Regions:
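Nucleotide phosphate-binding/pyrophosphate-handling subdomain across enzymes
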Residues: 6-19, 23-24, 28, 37, ...
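Acidic, Mg2+-coordinating active-site environments of NTP-dependent enzymes
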Residues: 15, 19-108, 121, 125-143
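Short acidic loop-to-helix transition motifs that present clustered carboxylates
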Residues: 2-5, 83-84
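Short beta->alpha linker loops
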Residues: 1, 56-60, 156, 174
């Protein structure tokens, strides 16, 4: 979908959490031709008082999203590049560390070879931590932690850096930024 205000998922009237992934130039004929305009459209999913977690690695987009969250009195948590780092890439798995208000330098493993997969996984983990704070009885205990770690390790993103045959990868990247990240990931494998 288009993401944001115009996305079909925005029909959920009372979400428990809003998540905005990285923003780059895409669908410019509909969303606008600047990062700020696109971020404004993406921020259209934010609902009054509903927590929002977002990728803040593009500063112009982050400012727009944070401003919109403030306008709507929505608690806002930003994922910044300094909060995670890739530790090791081995056998099509990435080990990375994540340091947030909820996780102090925890180690995670995900399948894949692309940096954007680390960003997306870190954002998903941060989102789960926020839900854990909101609903502690539903998301607590050692078994939850084990499930979260094993779920991340078993994650599969169809059409994103997907190996469709030995040493042949497919990625549905549809903008310049995504294609660049895919190219970097392929270089890492060769």
């Amino acid at each position: 979908g288009l993401g944001g205000r115009l996305d079909a998922t925005n029909s959920v009237a009372h979400p428990v959490l809003c998540i905005i992934t990285s923003i780059s130039l895409e669908h410019t004929e509909i969303l606008g031709d600047t990062i700020a305009q696109i971020a404004g459209e993406k921020a259209g999913i934010i609902k009054t008082g509903v927590p929002v977690v977002f990728d803040a690695n593009e500063s112009e987009a982050a400012a727009v999203i944070a401003d919109r969250a403030r306008e709507l009195h929505s608690p806002c948590t930003a994922l910044e590049k300094k909060m995670y780092r890739m530790l090791e890439f081995k056998n099509n798995f990435i080990d990375f560390s994540l340091s947030t208000a909820y996780d102090k330098e925890t180690r995670w493993t995900i399948p894949g070879a692309a940096d954007y997969q680390v960003e997306n996984a870190a954002l998903a983990i941060l989102a789960m931590r926020i839900l854990q704070q909101q609903y502690p009885s539903a998301f607590s205990g050692d078994s939850f932690e084990q499930q979260l770690h094993s779920g991340m390790k078993a994650a599969f993103w169809p059409g994103r850096m997907q190996e469709i045959a030995p040493e042949i990868y497919f990625d549905g990247a549809h903008n310049t930024s995504g294609i660049g990240m895919f190219t970097e990931a392929v270089k890492r494998l060769t």
